[in-house]
């Protein structure tokens, strides 16, 4: 009898585990918004930034499946953090489609920061969607090949078995920013910085770079108006670009793109290595979190993002990052 009960319990657990995991990953964790709190310990020359609060969001991927309740939750949480500067590091939409323009505008207009809201574009934010193809090359992805299920299998195959080197397809040309998205941004608090710099009241530089996959990453142009006597924040959607910025100024780089990745196994180590490859990065170790580059006196923060082409997450909840600037004599 006891053996029978034990077997029944074991079978129930075996059958229930995948169902519960599916429910968690599809319906619960995608709505578990988390705030990551970081401190930027300032050198004396940047002491004037003491107390400044910078909030970063990324990878909203707004589409018809994004719940209004989630957007309101994000907006309320950002407001509660009282940011002085708010930055958005790209991928406003999914696969170059502005599916719900009024919802996007309403959400962005609900966000405010006294020193300004700034944004760069991600690889989904151009007139044509650009990502890795089945061969691992960076290329435009047609509407047929960007269908969710097909794209998911392609991404998994490419991430695990194809090259992750940042190689462009021979036919890929620089892509233009999505005109519909750009038009919407003009009517929101966000200033789009596309290979441009802005200086805030002789306090800090904000640099926004074009997306690397879209062949619009142009740091030489972006830093033209950079004030080298002031600290700098750099917005670059793809964290792989950190190694292309070694010859340029700037103290903190904010990125996204990887989503964490959305399905992440933090342990054991080999499982974490495999799931990090799902980020599609050339440097998968940069899939999430804070990184320090002492030789350049630079920090990189890679945000897990808010959404995705599919709202599924496991051990990688959606994220808002708050960075506080602190100077201690």
Curated annotation (Swiss-Prot):
Subcellular location: Cell inner membrane
SUPFAM superfamilies to which the protein is assigned, alphabetical: Metallo-dependent phosphatases
Catalytic activity: UDP-2,3-diacyl-alpha-D-glucosamine + H2O = 2,3-diacyl-alpha-D-glucosaminyl 1-phosphate + UMP + 2 H(+)
Cofactor note: Binds 2 divalent metal cations.
Top EC class for this record: hydrolase
Keywords associated with the record: Cell inner membrane, Cell membrane, Hydrolase, Manganese, Membrane, Metal-binding, Transmembrane, Transmembrane helix
Swiss-Prot/TrEMBL GO biological process terms: lipid A biosynthetic process
Membrane topology: Single-pass membrane protein
Names of required cofactors: Mn(2+)
InterPro entries, A to Z: Calcineurin-like_PHP_ApaH, Metallo-depent_PP-like, Metallophosphoesterase_sf
CC per GO annotation: plasma membrane
Keyword hit for Glycoprotein: no
Keyword Ribosomal protein on entry: no
Membership in a protein family: Belongs to the metallophosphoesterase superfamily. LpxG family.
Protein's recorded name: UDP-2,3-diacylglucosamine pyrophosphatase LpxG
Organism in which the protein naturally occurs: Chlamydia trachomatis serovar D (strain ATCC VR-885 / DSM 19411 / UW-3/Cx)
